[in-house]
Amino acid sequence: MTRTFPGTVFSNREGVTLPENGCGITVGNFDGVHLGHREIVARLISLVQSRGLPAVALTFDPHPAELLHPGLARHFLTTTRRRAELLLSLGLDAVFVLNTTRELLNLSAEEFYSEVLCRRFRPAAIAEGEDFHFGHNRQGTLSDLQRWADRDSIALTAVTPVQIAGTAVSSSRIRVLLEEGNVADANDLLVFPYRVEGQVVEGQRRGKALGFPTANLGNVHTLVPHDGVYAGVATTASGARYGAAIHVGKNLTFSATERTIEVHLLGFTGDLYGQLLQVEFFQRLRSTEKFDGVEALREQLHADVVHVESLSRLNVGKPQTQGVSLSSTRFSG
């Protein structure tokens, strides 16, 4: 009996189908979509352009680590939809997202190659990083993939990891930088500045009373940088972009115990409750601190806003991945 592995395909056009003569494909988790991923995608596109074949990515939802290590608290850099959006912005024709199941994770490397890659996608070309592993317990290596690809007359390109400051760019390296609050260095490794998104929820309205109203972000499903005050840009559901002073952490002046994300949108007037808000982080300005009183806090908030104004003017223009309009379709695998 033929096993099927269903999922969702994302594209910036309707009705994506793979031609009978195959496609170019790259497989990975692509968390964050960083400079190394961009290099792999660029090499893949160059492989298939002359053949007139589509270039696609294959990824997984949920992340395999969530099934393999369910008790391990780990926050990822991008949602599935955001990963697809970023990958498509690099020029891919489609992003296929397989439903991650135990059955899928238990496939041997050769079973994954034959039953998923070859049977479903009929690849004419594959591009992967030199450290690529696949199959049950990551047992498959690039050497295995090369051997089978040679047998099946599939062009395989191995891409050397991109290095910045002498160290390979990786999702785990970016994760560490963000957990340290070093968003500027993290952004140097990413294709686009780091972003979180969530729904604006009711807060304590302390910012409004101080003259600096904030949107309180809830339902954030990706990694939130280390506590501190940041300069960034916020994008509303309508697509309007504003310079933003972002406070991450507990409000120590008011002895708050809950960690929150509070965003002051420079020049914005209106009500954002219930709306989706996207927040990009550009630079960490300072640590959170407890002030002696409300006036001292107000003075610092004013200084933060002035600082953000001096940094954000060049970054409030076009939104990230402008022009990528996602459509999604279920596929049976």
Positions of PLM-derived features:
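Short acidic-hydrophobic, aromatic-tinged amphipathic segments that line or gate anion-handling sites
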Residues: 2-15, 96
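Phosphate/ribose-recognition catalytic cores of enzymes acting on nucleotide-derived substrates
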Residues: 203-333
